[in-house]
């Protein structure tokens, strides 16, 4: 059977290597350097285009746990990265050029990997295909993905609102309700008085913003204004927009609040809550500072901060099985940021799972899904079951199930979840008995 992996980024590199290591031939397509993206500069695979950090190594961070799980599964990205690690405190940082160059050499010289340097415009002739073309997928291949998935399921921009850990919200500073009493009370309304709104509004206007890159300039014309841009249109504009209190009565006062910030469940379990309509270009420290002025969020832990930037990704919850296979065409798998995961390690992790599942399909075995108790499993569960429109997500502990036993202390709870995750990923690896682990 013929196998093709499209895109030699972090996810595509992991997938191709897993398939090749299992003893199967794979065509790995990469359009660079024949055709560059606006962000890439080199011809190397898995080029690190933003920060050179792969995130914290601490087990109390989602990124730290994810890397430990990837080590258990065998990650070529991490193996190479360790050779070119640079001092960065608790973070895992790499010499980006040496890392990408070495990885490229390994994949190009692998006897089972046939590297094809050309832009893919239509699906190649192959029995099994992994699409891992990333956030800057070419225009031509984006059209092909639209044909495969349906145009309404392919997004070209992130307009991401911040997401908080529900367990850190002060629920005494608001109430659950839908507007006009409709629905089942799915929104938590963070209440602000006139004075609190005034302070919030003034700080929002002062907040430092991230400048848009040239290739992101068109985003504002997509009808998705950042909250700070709405605020600049006038002091009361937010009160008729994302902070409008109409149709809501505070049960404590029996009156309509002056302003509200609505929180909506991001996952089925309700452990993640997003700030509705709060997409923003504010710098990260500014977001934490300003959004913490909302009384209910004074001590909230932000597991994801807002952004607006160019990012091609599919609505995986409508399209993918938890095995990363396309529901309607299970011989096509997706991996990496195009699935709606965010960050280097999350992208690489989905590539590992896609590679494992392709190898299993070639072995005549059923594709598999990692346990939801693991960070990899939690991420895949999130992107394939998101309640509303999928907004990209990176590794964080709110993706994992709540503990059955009560443990005091946030760090202690995270460490217990990490212990369970590592035990479960090791057991799962033994259970699936695939050639990829030989």
Curated annotation (Swiss-Prot):
PANTHER family the record matches: GLUCOSE INHIBITED DIVISION PROTEIN A (PTHR11806), METHYLENETETRAHYDROFOLATE--TRNA-(URACIL-5-)-METHYLTRANSFERASE TRMFO (PTHR11806:SF2)
Domain of life: Bacteria
Organism of this sequence: Sulfurihydrogenibium sp. (strain YO3AOP1)
Matches recorded under HAMAP family: TrmFO
Cellular-component GO terms for this entry: cytosol
GO molecular function: flavin adenine dinucleotide binding; tRNA (uracil(54)-C5)-methyltransferase activity, 5,10-methylenetetrahydrofolate-dependent
Chain residues that bind FAD: 7-12
Coiled coil: none
GO biological process: tRNA methylation; tRNA wobble uridine modification
Known role: Catalyzes the folate-dependent formation of 5-methyl-uridine at position 54 (M-5-U54) in all tRNAs.
Subcellular location(s) per record: Cytoplasm
UniProt family annotation: Belongs to the MnmG family. TrmFO subfamily.
Tagged with keyword GTP-binding: no
Catalytic activity: uridine(54) in tRNA + (6R)-5,10-methylene-5,6,7,8-tetrahydrofolate + NADH + H(+) = 5-methyluridine(54) in tRNA + (6S)-5,6,7,8-tetrahydrofolate + NAD(+); uridine(54) in tRNA + (6R)-5,10-methylene-5,6,7,8-tetrahydrofolate + NADPH + H(+) = 5-methyluridine(54) in tRNA + (6S)-5,6,7,8-tetrahydrofolate + NADP(+)
Keyword field: Cytoplasm, FAD, Flavoprotein, Methyltransferase, NAD, NADP, Transferase, tRNA processing
Record EC number: 2.1.1.74
Record protein name field: Methylenetetrahydrofolate--tRNA-(uracil-5-)-methyltransferase TrmFO
InterPro entries in UniProt: FAD/NAD-bd_sf, MnmG-rel, MnmG-rel_CS, MnmG_N, TrmFO
Keyword Transferase on entry: yes
Cofactor: FAD
């Amino acid at each position: 059977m013929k196998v093709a992996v499209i895109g030699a980024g972090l996810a595509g590199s992991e997938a191709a290597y897993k398939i090749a290591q299992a003893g199967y031939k794979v065509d790995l397509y990469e359009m660079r350097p024949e055709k560059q993206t606006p962000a890439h500069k080199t011809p190397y695979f898995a080029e690190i285009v933003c920060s050179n950090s792969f995130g914290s190594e601490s087990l109390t961070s989602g990124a730290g746990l994810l890397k430990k799980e990837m080590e258990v599964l065998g990650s070529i990205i991490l193996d190479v990265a360790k050779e070119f690690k640079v001092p960065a405190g608790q973070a895992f940082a790499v010499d980006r050029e040496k890392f990408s160059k070495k990885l490229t050499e390994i994949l190009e010289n692998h006897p089972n990997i046939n590297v094809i340097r050309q832009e893919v415009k239509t699906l190649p002739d192959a029995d099994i295909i992994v699409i891992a073309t990333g956030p800057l997928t070419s225009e031509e291949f984006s059209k092909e993905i639209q044909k495969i998935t349906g145009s309404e399921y392919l997004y070209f921009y992130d307009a991401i609102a911040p997401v908080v850990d529900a367990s850190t919200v002060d629920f005494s500073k608001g109430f659950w309700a839908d507007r006009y009493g409709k629905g089942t009370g799915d929104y938590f309304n963070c209440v602000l008085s006139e004075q609190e709104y005034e302070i919030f509004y003034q700080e929002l206007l002062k907040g430092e913003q991230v400048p848009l890159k040239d290739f992101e300039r068109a985003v504002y014309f997509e009808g998705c204004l950042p909250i700070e841009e709405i605020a600049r249109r006038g002091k009361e504009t937010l009160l008729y927009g994302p902070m409008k209190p109409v149709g809501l009565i505070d049960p404590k006062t029996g009156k309509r609040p002056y302003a509200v910030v609505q929180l909506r469940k991001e996952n089925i379990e309700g452990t993640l809550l997003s700030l509705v309509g709060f997409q923003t270009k504010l710098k990260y420290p500014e977001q934490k500072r300003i959004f913490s002025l909302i009384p209910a969020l004074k001590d909230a832990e932000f597991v994801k901060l807002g952004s607006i930037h160019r990012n091609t990704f599919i609505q995986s919850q409508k399209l993918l099985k938890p095995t990363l296979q396309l529901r309607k065409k299970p011989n096509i798998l997706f991996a990496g940021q195009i699935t709606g995961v965010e960050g280097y390690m999350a992208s690489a992790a989905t590539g590992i799972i896609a590679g494992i599942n392709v190898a299993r399909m070639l072995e005549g075995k059923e594709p598999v899904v990692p346990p939801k108790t693991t960070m990899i499993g939690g991420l895949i569960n999130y992107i394939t079951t998101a309640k509303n429109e999928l907004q990209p997500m990176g590794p964080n502990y709110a993706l994992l199930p709540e503990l059955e036993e009560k443990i005091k202390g946030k760090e202690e709870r995270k460490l217990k979840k990490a212990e369970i995750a590592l035990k479960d990923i090791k057991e799962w690896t033994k259970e699936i008995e695939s050639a990829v682990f030989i």
